[in-house]
Amino acid sequence: VQENPALTWVFFVYTKTRYGSSFDPAKRTKTLTERGLDFADAGHVFAGFHFTRADDRRVYGERRYVTAGLLRGRLIVLVWTPRGTARRIISMRHANDREKALFEKNLG
């Protein structure tokens, strides 16, 4: 696994916050249909071991973050932005092999 030194992950363990989640209902339905993942379950990812980094791949007009964490024993990647007292979920997908290896390496 090659690591990108410009890519910085912050490790969180069982984050306890007052943040809830919000999302676009149509996008939630599409992700549930196409990937079998429900945006409504994002809180479970944040409640467990997870890594979060700023998503600075481009200028989005808002702060975005990428979080990798476990959901029902599988590694999930979320893209989200803070909106008031909620995390607005933008996307949710299963991690690829490179992300899985990086996650396991950082846990070990």
Language-model segment annotations:
Residues 1-108:
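Ribonuclease/tRNase effector modules and their secretory precursors
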